[in-house]
Curated annotation (Swiss-Prot):
Its main location: mitochondrion. It is a multi-pass membrane protein. It is found in: Mitochondrion membrane. Associates with the respiratory chain complex III/complex IV supercomplex. Residues 6-97 form the HIG1 domain. Residues 134-161 are annotated as: Disordered. Keywords: Membrane, Mitochondrion, Transmembrane, Transmembrane helix. It comes from Aspergillus fumigatus (strain ATCC MYA-4609 / CBS 101355 / FGSC A1100 / Af293). One of its GO terms (biological process) is mitochondrial respirasome assembly. Cytochrome c oxidase subunit which plays a role in assembly of respiratory supercomplexes. This is Respiratory supercomplex factor 1, mitochondrial. Belongs to the RCF1 family. Residues 134-154 have a biased composition (Basic and acidic residues). The keyword Mitochondrion applies.
């Protein structure tokens, strides 16, 4: 339940799906086909004007420059008309993109918080284990030493204090483990 995204009114609408740049280009080309047509007409007029200039035909060159201006005007009108026609759809798309961005930011934030919680839990568990080990070590250190017999004292006097076996951390943990069972 926690991993599922919240339902959205735009979720089932195929018009508002995330799209790649190529898909966006194709969609815009289908929505406003007059703009690329005007750009192509402008480029063709410039090409013809260039060819006329190379040929030395100034009359044809002037006609093509005028045609270029008309083609640019047509392109500009197509841009303005398309902008007015698709204004509401673009606003909806911007709102959808904002929602997608907010959802991604929220998912990133939630993942970060989950990771922090996991780290905090691991740290808390480690501290508890460390405290238990410390307590077991202190308890093992407080145990009274076994009473020595006089014969053992003579034999032990040859053993240096550094060679004596002391209770280590592993023994303390083992003792703690046995007490819990």
């Amino acid at each position: 339940m926690l991993n599922e995204p919240l339902p959205s009114s735009m979720e089932d609408n195929p018009q508002f799906k995330e799209e790649t740049s190529l898909q966006k280009f194709r969609r815009r080309l289908k929505e406003e086909p007059l703009i690329p047509l005007g750009c192509a007409a402008t480029c063709y007029a410039l090409y013809r004007a260039y060819r006329s200039m190379k040929a030395g035909d100034s009359v044809e060159m002037n006609k093509m420059f005028r045609a270029r201006i008309y083609a640019q005007f047509f392109t500009l009108v197509a841009v303005v008309a398309g902008g007015m026609y698709y204004k509401t759809e673009r606003q909806q798309r911007r709102e959808f993109e904002k929602m997608v961005e907010q959802r991604k930011a929220q998912e990133k934030r939630d993942a970060w918080l989950r990771e922090l919680e996991i780290r905090d839990k691991e740290d808390k568990d480690w501290r508890e284990r460390h405290a238990a080990i410390e307590a077991a070590a202190k308890e093992a250190g407080k145990r009274p030493a076994p009473k020595k017999l006089p014969e053992q004292d003579a034999a032990r006097s040859a053993i240096e204090p550094a060679d004596e076996r002391s209770i280590g951390v592993l023994s303390a943990v083992r003792d703690l483990w046995m007490q819990q069972k």
